[in-house]
Amino acid sequence: MASPPAPPAKKRKMNFSEREVEIIVEELERGKHLLINHFNAGVPLAAKAAAWHDILRRVNAVATCHRELPEVKKKWSDLKTEVRRKVAQVRAAMEGGGESQNGGGAGTEGEDPTGATAAPVILTPMQQRICNLLGEATIISLPSGDCGAGRRDRDPHHRLRHHRHADPGVSAAPSEVPAETTYHSLEDGVVEYCTTEAPTTVTAEAPLEMMAHQHEVSAKPQELKSRIALNSAKLLQEQRVTNLHVKEIAQHLEQQNDLLQMIRRSQEVQACAQERQAQAMEGTQAALSALIQVLRPMIKDFRRFLQSNTPSPSVTADPNQTGQQDGIIQ
């Protein structure tokens, strides 16, 4: 007995493209008061479902294959999971870095106890936007002893200098501060950058004040990084929204231009039809004139024929003859 045919293998869909992910994040930023948990208190389920269907419609407008609503929700869940995992790594590494600085670990900054350099965890701009939507701590990068990794990515000439408290016995030894060093401080929300300084030598005469100042410079609050990253994310979001509006305006103008061209073509067609009508009227008038000229002689001949066939009136009788006839009759 033959076995039943195996069901056809389900064709695997393509991964979400960057444009699809960007549309999902943009729509969630636009409708965060409907779809994000810590914003949508009291929002009815019908409004949430309508917002998700709008997102699905926009994704399918640019997707190469048809997407279903569970796929879009699953993609958003995966994006949130990835961002939260990176944020957890950042926090854990920062706590570990703080303990190593306070405890004066044997390893150098930016290195694990085994001697291997820890790779920084960097959030992409898209992940930073998702992080802002989720309400997580806004962190550009994880420095294992180097908090300026994200800034160095943006500007290689800017470097963040970190200092630790040195032992009293070691503070007497001169230590040079390398040139091309970046300082940034939080004073009333103002970030100051000072680059390409000359090397500074810390001597034993005034080590305590210098090291205390350097420690204050190095121990920057998380609020500064959060504020910088949040401002960057907002600017990027506004720029993308502006670009989207510009594209929509351009599409609207193109549609208007197409409509005007159609109107012009219809007017040209109407003008051609009117011109053909005028030419036809002129031809008809010419034909009627020729017909009238042909019929005139025929009408004249017909009149003559009628006149020739009509009997002439009788001649008037003589009055004498008329009187004789009257007498005979009497």
Swiss-Prot record:
Region (Required for nuclear localization and apoptosis-inducing activity): 1-74
Family statement: Belongs to the NAIF1 family.
One Pfam assignment: Myb_DNA-bind_5
InterPro entries per the UniProt record, alphabetical: Myb_DNA-bind_5
UniProt-listed GO biological process terms: homologous chromosome pairing at meiosis; meiotic DNA double-strand break processing involved in reciprocal meiotic recombination; oogenesis; regulation of mitochondrial membrane permeability involved in apoptotic process; spermatogenesis
Location of the region described as Disordered in the Swiss-Prot/TrEMBL record: 92-117, 147-175, 309-330
Name of the protein in question: Nuclear apoptosis-inducing factor 1
Compartments (UniProt record): Nucleus
Species annotation: Gallus gallus
